[in-house]
């Protein structure tokens, strides 16, 4: 399970959708999952439920990518990511309550601090062949390649 986390508007969906499509793996977007479950509860319990829901969906496949805010360490723990990508591309979001709640992660595998050019993204991913790798090697290689952008 690969988690792409960060403030709303930081580029989680942009990156997750492209990675999912490129590698033909599921991308679970938290906003879309909330729509499916008609759950827009953003208090502590609602956020915990969303984190657990995202984990269950991500575990349906051997490799999956999920994008959601994960504002607190506990929610990140609930998700149990194999790899975490922190989209640290903005200082604050349009949602003041989320800005106040969000704690930058202490543990992550990759921190992205600038917007990624789409052509550069696809060029760096070009030689990763998911069909010849186990999930751990794929996740490791993905983090290495993205880290070079």
Feature-to-residue mapping (PLM):
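Glycine-rich phosphate-binding loop used to anchor ATP phosphates in small-molecule kinases
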Residues: 44-95
């Amino acid at each position: 399970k690969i988690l792409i986390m960060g403030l709303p508007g930081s580029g989680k969906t942009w990156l997750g959708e492209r990675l999912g499509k490129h590698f033909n793996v599921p991308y679970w977007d938290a906003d879309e999952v909330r729509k499916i479950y008609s759950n827009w509860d953003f208090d502590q319990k609602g956020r915990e439920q969303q984190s657990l829901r995202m984990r269950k969906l991500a575990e349906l496949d051997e490799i999956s990518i999920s994008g959601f805010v994960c504002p607190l360490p506990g929610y990140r723990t609930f998700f149990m990511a194999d790899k975490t990508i922190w989209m640290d591309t903005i200082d604050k979001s349009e949602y003041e309550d989320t800005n106040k709640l969000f704690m930058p992660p202490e543990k992550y595998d990759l921190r992205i601090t600038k917007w990624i050019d789409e052509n550069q993204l696809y060029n760096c991913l070009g030689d990763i062949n998911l069909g010849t790798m186990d999930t751990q090697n794929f996740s490791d290689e993905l983090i290495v390649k993205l880290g070079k952008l």
